[in-house]
A protein has these predicted regions:
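Short, small-residue-rich loop/turn micro-motifs
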Residues: 32, 106, 172, 242, ...
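Active-site diphosphate/adenylate-binding microenvironment
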Residues: 13-23, 31-34, 39-46, 347-419, ...
Length: 557
């Protein structure tokens, strides 16, 4: 039932709750506090938005981030001023890295004390400066007259390309102030840059001339599924970043997926005569620190003009929205390109080789990878991954995705975000259960949010890979530091006992042949479940993973 229009007796807090519901927000994540009570009291009274009380602000932000990625809409996180907003900062850095459509509504002390270092509690003298470091933009609601403008500006900025998390400060006395009466609320229309026609024409000309063209799809192409798939249908091969997975289904023969940096990818790149990069930063961890040779001419489409040629010199750059620019390129291309008929076959062959090479490194965990891939492929489950060896090996590449909204992972590389991200993804799925891959070390950071999953009856299966250590750190120490394993083996709880204490169903798997049955049983039941995989009992991977071949792990000479 819709709430009546804002009346003369309503407050700005009422208007905020009303506005969010009117533009389609149905779920909000956060932690209640003295400085955001006027908003949450209104949310509860109006009854139009489901509020998910996280156990910490970092968890709330991770939930909102994952919710945005899976739903394709706006994720909303509500925190309080000061320490609470700071608690969310690390998780918001992840949302910024991923370009997630998140609105972070935080608060401020009374307007007369804000920015003056005089408030009694929860005051941060330079809170906007802190927020700017992890936000696409920062806004403040100064009074009730400007409530509609502040909300519209913040929401529009979060949704507009290039998207990203936006912070909105609302002083508590402004929340309590009388609202301005408005007859209706109108949802903002996101803005998207339009590429110059001359760049579109030049790209179309070069693609038409190429015999073995490739398109590299990043996270900025997640809204261009139809256009990217059509380009593949006309004869262009596909490779993706980890954040661009599923833009073109990974079941397609002509899609190499995220096997983008191994010897098979290098062989493919060496045989191709054009690459079009769409919505990707070509980050160093996927391009061997930007030293991996890529096909030329190299074309780039990005909604962020500053990304043009940032990590690789390009021959043509189009500043524009991915879907719109690709559609305009397609309009200038023939229905079937005159490309090498063997290109799709070569990609399928090289992908099969890459998958086989990966399976050889997994040892007993091939069974786990196959079971999860089969479940995700058949059910279309959201596939959420924390930073763990299992994700760095098979999670990021081997488990095939057919839709970009299926994939959620910690793009910025910070551990411990998977527990909360699983909840946000699960509540956005509206279908099959989400599956979240965790490690025991990272789980320690987000453990409190497991009871949130129970409380919310989240449709979610946690697969907890427990090797009783920071496994990848130990492997790096073995490879780079003569096996000096300092500080990497930390105590973890008995997860079965912990789960029992919060009412979370739990099963421990100590034989890989029991994993698939445990997974299917967990997927068939309601609510959250934990499958703990005892890696100490099962044994090691066939080949130790000691970090990516580029990046901070370095290489011992």
């Amino acid at each position: 039932m819709k709430h009546d229009p804002i009346s003369k007796t309503d407050t700005v807090g009422d208007f905020i709750a009303h506005y969010l519901a009117e533009i389609g927000v149905s779920v909000m994540f956060g932690v209640i506090s003295i400085h955001n009570m006027p908003i949450l009291d209104a949310v509860a009274r109006q009854g139009r938005i489901r509020f998910v009380p996280a156990r910490g602000e970092a968890g709330a932000m991770n939930m909102a981030d994952a919710y945005a990625r899976v739903s394709g809409g706006l994720g909303v996180c509500l925190t309080s001023t000061g320490t609470a907003a700071g608690n969310a900062a690390g998780a918001q850095a992840e949302a910024l890295t991923a370009g997630s459509r998140v609105l972070h509504i935080t608060t401020q002390v009374d307007l007369g004390y804000a920015d003056r270092d005089r408030a009694a509690i929860h005051d941060v003298p330079r809170q906007p400066e802190m927020l700017r470091g992890v936000s696409k933009s920062v806004h403040r609601m100064w009074d009730s007259n400007g409530a509609i403008g502040a909300l519209t500006a913040a929401v529009s900025d979060a949704l507009s390309a290039p998207s990203g998390p936006v912070s909105l400060e609302i002083p508590v006395d402004v929340q309590r102030a009388p609202a301005v009466v408005m007859a209706a609320v109108h949802a903002p229309v996101p803005t998207r840059p339009s590429a110059p026609q001359s760049a579109v024409e030049e790209m179309a000309r070069l693609i038409t001339q190429a015999k073995r063209p490739l398109i590299w799809l990043g996270g900025g192409a997640r809204g261009a599924v139809e256009e990217a798939t059509e380009l593949m249908r006309r004869g262009v091969g596909v490779v993706t970043s980890t954040n661009g997975r599923g833009v073109v289904s990974e079941e397609e023969a002509a899609n190499l997926g995220a096997f983008n940096m191994g010897p098979d990818a290098m062989e493919l790149y060496g045989s191709c005569d054009l690459m079009l990069v769409v919505g990707s930063r070509l980050r160093g961890n996927e391009t061997r620190n930007n030293k991996m040779p890529l096909p030329r001419p190299l074309l780039q489409i990005d909604a962020d003009a500053s990304q043009g040629g940032r990590n690789y010199p390009v021959d043509v750059f189009a500043h524009g929205d991915a879907a719109d620019t690709l559609r305009r390129v397609l309009d200038l291309l023939p229905e079937t390109l005159d490309t090498d008929e063997a290109l799709a076959f070569d990609i399928a062959r090289l992908k099969a080789q890459a998958e086989g090479r990966l399976r050889d490194t997994l040892g007993p965990y091939t069974v786990v990878a196959e079971a999860i891939s089969g479940a995700v492929g058949a059910g279309g489950n959201a596939w959420v991954r924390d930073v763990t060896i299992s994700n760095s090996t098979y999670g990021n590449r081997y488990v095939r995705l057919s839709d970009p909204r299926q994939g959620v992972h910690a793009l910025g590389g910070g551990i411990g975000q998977g527990v909360a991200m699983g909840i946000g993804a699960a509540l956005a799925s509206h279908g099959p259960k989400a599956i979240a891959l965790l490690g025991d070390g990272g789980t320690m950071l987000g453990l409190a949010e497991m009871i949130t999953a129970v409380d919310e009856k989240a449709p979610l299966v946690y697969v907890l890979m427990n090797d009783q250590a920071y496994g990848v750190i130990e492997n790096i120490q073995d490879a780079q530091y003569d096996s000096r394993r300092h500080y990497s083996k930390v105590a973890v709880p008995e997860f079965g006992a912990f789960c029992g204490s919060i009412g979370m169903p739990h099963v421990k798997v100590d034989r890989v042949d029991a994993f698939e049955a445990a997974l299917q049983a967990a997927l068939a039941t309601e609510g959250p479940r934990v499958i703990e995989v005892d890696m100490c009992a099962i044994g090691p991977f066939a080949e130790a993973f000691a970090g990516p071949p580029a990046g901070a792990a370095g290489k011992k000479e």
